């Protein structure tokens, strides 16, 4: 899917479990970099390995992502149970996007997709989104489990006061 076609293809990836406003902002800003936005969605096997559980099943996450304005396609990863490769290298090699966007706390030194992006000629872009990492699925789930205890973002506030509109 290189740019010798008419359209510049942008890809993003993540578990998105659950989807939150930071993800939506990342998608909006990523879409501005090209014509087509593909979201590579890490499957339930990947989430189970990374977090030890799945909060929202992959088919529900996929349906939500497909409903977000600006998202043109959602591709589910093919990670097997208990994967050793936690990257989206296979999906990037298959899709061959022009740009691979990373949000939040990702940077060149901590993403495993650098080599495949170099190989396929895909530009990597970091820190996409409005205001950096504004929310985290892990923060949301941790606060829920802890009954809205101290916000894990380090603000010193209770989670509801820090990140909820009517907290």
What are these regions (language model features)?
Residues 145-167:
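Acidic/negatively charged segments and metal-coordination signatures
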Residues 1-147:
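Nucleotidyltransferase catalytic core that binds NTPs
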């Amino acid at each position: 899917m290189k740019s010798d076609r008419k359209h510049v293809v942008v890809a993003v990836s993540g578990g998105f479990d659950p989807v939150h406003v930071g993800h939506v902002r990342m998608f909006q800003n990523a879409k501005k970099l090209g014509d087509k936005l593909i979201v590579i969605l890490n499957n339930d096997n990947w989430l189970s390995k990374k977090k030890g559980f799945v909060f929202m099943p992959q088919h529900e996450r996929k349906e939500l992502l497909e409903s977000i304005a600006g998202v043109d396609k959602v591709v589910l990863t093919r990670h097997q149970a208990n994967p050793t490769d936690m990257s989206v290298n296979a999906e990037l090699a298959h899709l061959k996007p022009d740009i691979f966007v990373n949000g939040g706390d990702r940077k060149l030194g901590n993403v495993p997709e650098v080599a495949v992006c170099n190989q396929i000629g895909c530009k990597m872009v970091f820190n996409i989104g409005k205001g950096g990492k504004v929310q985290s699925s892990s923060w949301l789930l941790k606060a829920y489990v802890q009954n809205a205890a101290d916000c894990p973002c380090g603000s010193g506030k209770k989670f509801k006061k820090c990140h909820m509109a009517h907290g």
